[in-house]
Amino acid sequence: MKPGKRIGLLILAIALVAVIGISVYRMYQGGTAVATVPSAPAAVTEPPQTAQTKTEPAPTPTAEPAGPDYGDPTAWAYFALGEDKGVDVFLICPTVDTRSERNAYDLNEKLRSNFLYALDLEKGIYEEAGRLYSPYYRQMSINAYRLSDPDREKAKELAYSDISAAFRWYLDHENGDRPLILAGFSQGAEMCLELLKEFYGDTAEGNALRERLITVYAIGWRVTEADVQAYPQIVPAQGERDLGTVVSFDCEDGIVAETIILPAGVKTLSINPLNWKTDGTMADRSKNLGAVMATGAAPIPGLCGAYIGDRGQLVVTDVTAGEYPPALDVFPAGAYHVYDYMFFFMNLKQNLSDRVAAYDQARRGKVLCRLLEDLLMAYEQPGSEDETHIEADLSAIQAISEADYPVAKSIADHWRQVYLDPAYALCCHGEGDLAPELADAGIPNERTHAFVVLGYELQNGEMTDELKGRCEAAAAAARSFPNAILVCSGGATGPNNPEKHTEAGLMKQYLIEVCGIEESRIFTDERAMTTAENAVNTFAIMKEQGIESMTIVTSSYHQRWGQALYNALAAIYEQQQGYHARLIGNYCFDTQPSVEVFLKDDWFAIYQLGEILGLPRAQMDQLPNVYALLGM
């Protein structure tokens, strides 16, 4: 017997097939999820039930019992379970009640064990994200599907009223503005969609919740175009890292025409968990990282492939209905609903990790971009609230990333020094061969100090007077500090440069042939095309050469910009690589220092700071356009 067949029969054996001689048509119309999870082992002592051998359902109480008190931790199957990583998972159990007539009014010990058994099957997907919360609730039982449409709807409403109350309690007492993942299978998936409808709409709270929603795993249920149109907050996932979206699919063999999950004439908006595409592109079994068929079982890599069919169903390949029977007779052979997350367990687990990482990156980008924006606005339009905004930004960064905080604070402090402090002076080279202006700057005359010379765009493959002026300033500094080195940076720039001369290459040649600087003292970066690339490339050279301090040599209008970028990179290098190069003073080519007025090109300093910080381009593109602000 094949391993898959043994696994399928094992699941069939432990399932309480407590259903169901119910009209499939009526279930199609009911719109509520059905139980599809094997019961707890304690139930195995009872014989499997079929449409011919059913236990009579427990009658509905005359007076409806009160729902759980979610202020009591015993009302939760999982309560803050797992390591606190700053992310929570609100996980909703699928149907496990096969006894009650309508709803699970009596959440007794046996039923609670069924809850835990079902949840433990799924837990491995989600537990590495952070704390898990899963409420006991008066869920719909299998037998509720025998009821009339109005009574069946009442059963769903009662089940959801508990989920809603639990979620409300969680938000008020446990969430603390944490990012959140909603997850559920089958009935649990439908309840996740109901939470989106109630809590995530266009309200102040809903908008805030959507900002913190990492994703929704609503597996084993349907998401229709009508749902999306009626509730814009329900956004079907389109890829493997999009945020605030719904991951949904339900598995079939490609032959099944309809199920209670996906009735005839209904199309669901699914995503393939193997290739994260929403079209019919086939993902072969090699993309399957591993099926997990029982709690603690070893993954089975490459068990099956999948593609999305014309009804939106996820068609599973490489397995058969005989190997993986439906386990519940409410489903036809070939309906793999019970295996929805089991087949793709390791892919879902990896995807959860990817989405959390994407969320962290996006959240980091937002707060860092806000800081950059406020620094820019503080310089362009000074106001009394600037410092308040900047400090609030730094506090927000510290709250989400202790690692980013020292870098962000260094950026803010240095920006305030070079851009906002009127006392900050630019040191400009005169016309002599030496640099007496640097005498009091505290620059060491050591091989461990570097003068970093930033390039300027070439014209017709040749140096401009401005670039020559920067070289003259650098040469004066080199003569005044004969033990220091020079690092020239700049790639092949400018129009009409067929021989691809580089700024750095021509600077080196000029410094040697015209200025008389020893070649052994000059190092070059001939790749940089932006100031940010100047910083990145020259830092690599300085680290290799054991440089401990540096002074930027450039034009006066470019000095503050360069200072901001090099300081940011210095902070990042120190944090990430343990390498520190201290910025000392500045040296400029100019007859007069630039006056403290806004220079339109300094907008790019902020943009390039974003590049150095690794912020997503889409977020940087949302920074205010300074040209527009100034009418330039």
Language-model regions, residue ranges each:
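Active-site catalytic motif of lipid deacylating hydrolases and related acyltransferases
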Residues: 30, 92-179, 321-342, 346, ...
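Short glycine-enriched nucleophile-adjacent loop
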Residues: 192-200, 567
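Short, electropositive alpha-helical surface patch
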Residues: 144-159, 193-196, 501-515
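Gly/Ala-rich beta-loop-alpha elbow adjacent to hydrolase catalytic centers
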Residues: 184-188, 192, 558
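Flexible, membrane-associating and regulatory peripheral segments of lipid-active enzymes
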Residues: 2-124, 364-421
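Alpha/beta-hydrolase fold nucleophile elbow
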Residues: 174-184, 522, 550
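Surface cap/lid and interfacial helix-loop subdomains adjacent to catalytic sites
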Residues: 164-176, 198-366, 605-625
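A structural signal for short, hydrophobic/glycine-enriched beta-strand patches
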Residues: 375-392, 396-604
